[in-house]
């Protein structure tokens, strides 16, 4: 059994080994071995944000200012508009709220508008990135049974995808060191997340695996990221999906398959890794004893759904070798 810091070191070493060309075919199995060293933890009290109403009023204040600027067609550089750092901290904390009016239509909508309309300074964007990829955000209560920390984890990743998009298409505010840290943290998060809930009654969306798809799609679009790093990220997503024992019922598998098949069409290296992984999944089914627990059956059906989503993508959207293999093995549960 190991602690989170040790797992992070093992994943960092794996990433370097993939870069060096020392690991490829065994990447999934090595990740699996590392993940299995992390013991599940008992449920503990989740710390939730306070001051939701006050944060909402601050969001409304800034949104009103931004709307007035837009109506007057003012040039941003000529207007004294600035979100106070203290308010930004207050608002981003609401991403962890179980209440959608503070989290989803509140903090997420607000941050999305601020990022897309270039209303945060580069310093604030860098701070926001560091905040969202911190252990306290991405790994909060992640080894425990289902809990309210899922909102903190999932919406941190969702906003990260917006920051990565902005960094790629507008001003590159992230340093190489920060980008590397983002890749390390997101990869480990994708491998560790086990909460597959989509829409949760009055609390609204959690949707972690769709958000994983979004942020990973942005990582795959990084123009200067070497192929070995993209293989590592791909491996982490597939390793995490392999371990998932909860159903994904709100389109998450479709989104993941869309992102994975798209990158796999970009270079044969990614297609080879995807095909290798699918063959290992199929081999596990043939060689292992039949599932006996609900967890084992759910893992089996999750992988089956993954196969079927590849077929639904269509032959033109999937590498030929991958599509042909999945077509032959489409009776995955037989």
Task: Indicate residue ranges for each PLM-predicted region.
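Long, repeat-rich segments with strong aromatic
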Residues: 223-318
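Eukaryote-skewed repeat-based solenoidal scaffolds used as protein-protein interaction platforms
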Residues: 114-266
């Amino acid at each position: 059994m190991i602690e989170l810091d040790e797992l992070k070191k093992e994943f960092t070493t794996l990433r370097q080994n993939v870069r060096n060309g020392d690991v490829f075919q065994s990447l999934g199995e090595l990740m699996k071995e590392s993940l299995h060293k992390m013991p599940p933890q008992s449920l503990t009290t989740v710390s939730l944000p306070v001051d939701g109403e006050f944060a909402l009023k601050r969001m409304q204040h800034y949104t009103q200012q931004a709307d007035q600027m837009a109506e007057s067609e003012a040039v941003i550089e000529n207007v004294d508009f600035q979100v106070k750092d203290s308010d930004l901290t207050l608002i981003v904390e609401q991403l962890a709220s179980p209440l959608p009016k503070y989290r989803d239509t509140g903090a997420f909508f607000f941050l999305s508008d601020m990022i897309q309309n270039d209303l945060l300074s580069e310093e604030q964007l860098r701070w926001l990135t560091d905040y969202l990829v911190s252990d306290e955000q991405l790994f909060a209560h992640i080894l425990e049974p289902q809990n309210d920390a899922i909102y903190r984890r999932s919406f941190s990743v969702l906003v990260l995808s917006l920051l990565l998009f902005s960094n790629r298409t507008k001003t590159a505010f992230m340093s190489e060191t920060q980008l590397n840290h983002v890749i390390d943290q997101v990869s480990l998060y994708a491998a560790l997340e086990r909460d597959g809930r989509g829409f949760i009654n009055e609390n609204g969306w959690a949707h972690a695996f769709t958000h994983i798809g979004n942020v990973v799609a942005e990582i795959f679009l990084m123009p200067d990221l070497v192929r070995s790093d993209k293989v590592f990220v791909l491996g982490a997503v597939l390793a995490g999906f392999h371990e998932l024992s909860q159903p994904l019922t709100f389109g998450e598998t479709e989104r993941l398959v869309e992102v994975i098949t798209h990158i796999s069409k970009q270079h044969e290296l990614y297609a080879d890794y995807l095909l290798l992984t699918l063959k290992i999944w199929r081999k596990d089914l043939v060689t292992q004893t039949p599932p006996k627990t609900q967890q084992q059956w759910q893992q089996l059906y999750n992988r089956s759904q993954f196969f079927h989503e590849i077929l639904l993508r269509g032959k033109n959207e999937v590498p030929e070798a991958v599509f042909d293999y999945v077509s032959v093995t489409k009776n995955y549960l037989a």
